[in-house]
């Protein structure tokens, strides 16, 4: 669920508050359209698509609870997760790891979506 995703982000990117990823580019935050503005925004675009695939399985990605571990900045999804929990955990894990490897550009935070995300 979103609370667990926030904690995953904190695991892989402890130096930056999670909310910096909630309103970034065209895809980080609710919804998303247009062309991703950079690599970090592409992480969110992939995450959005992953949630879309989970929904096709009949899952509720924003609400699904899953089991995972964070150890020294490394995430693992637990093997005991059911189909939906495993799918959503994997979406969040991939995104959190992607965030850790992408450059954060302050100018892409809280952008004008109407102008830049056509």
Curated annotation (Swiss-Prot):
The keyword Mitochondrion does not apply. It is found in: Secreted. GO terms for molecular function: calcium ion binding; calcium-dependent phospholipase A2 activity; phospholipid binding; toxin activity. Ca(2+) binds at residues 27, 29, 31, 48. It is an enzyme of class 3 (hydrolase). GO terms for cellular component: extracellular region. Coiled coil: none annotated. Binds 1 Ca(2+) ion. The keyword Protein biosynthesis does not apply. Keywords: Blood coagulation cascade inhibiting toxin, Calcium, Disulfide bond, Hemostasis impairing toxin, Hydrolase, Lipid degradation, Lipid metabolism, Metal-binding, Myotoxin, Neurotoxin, Secreted, Toxin. One of its GO terms (biological process) is lipid catabolic process. Its cofactor is Ca(2+). Expressed by the venom gland. Its EC number is 3.1.1.4. SMART domains: PA2c. It catalyses: a 1,2-diacyl-sn-glycero-3-phosphocholine + H2O = a 1-acyl-sn-glycero-3-phosphocholine + a fatty acid + H(+). The active site is at residues 47, 92. Disulfide bonds join 11-70, 26-117, 28-44, 43-98, 50-91, 59-84, 77-89. Belongs to the phospholipase A2 family. Group I subfamily. D49 sub-subfamily. Snake venom phospholipase A2 (PLA2) that causes myonecrosis when injected intramuscularly, causes neuromuscular blockade with a gradual contracture and a decreased sensitivity to ACh and KCl (in the chick biventer cervicis nerve-muscle preparation), abolishes twitches evoked by indirect stimulation earlier than those by direct stimulation (in the mouse phrenic nerve-diaphragm preparation), shows indirect hemolytic activity, and shows weak anticoagulant activity. PLA2 catalyzes the calcium-dependent hydrolysis of the 2-acyl groups in 3-sn-phosphoglycerides. This is Basic phospholipase A2 CM-II. It comes from Naja mossambica (Mozambique spitting cobra).
């Amino acid at each position: 669920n979103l609370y667990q995703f926030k904690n995953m982000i904190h695991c892989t990117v402890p130096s930056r508050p999670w909310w910096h990823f909630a309103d970034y580019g065209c895809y980080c935050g609710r919804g998303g359209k247009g062309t991703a503005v950079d690599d970090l925004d592409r992480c969110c675009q992939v995450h959005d698509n992953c949630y879309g695939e989970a929904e096709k399985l009949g899952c509720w990605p924003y609400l699904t609870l899953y089991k995972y571990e964070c150890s020294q900045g490394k995430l693992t999804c637990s093997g005991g997760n059911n189909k939906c929990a495993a799918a959503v955990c994997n979406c969040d894990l991939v995104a959190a790891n992607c965030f850790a490897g992408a450059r954060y550009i302050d100018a892409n935070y809280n952008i004008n979506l109407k102008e830049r995300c056509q």
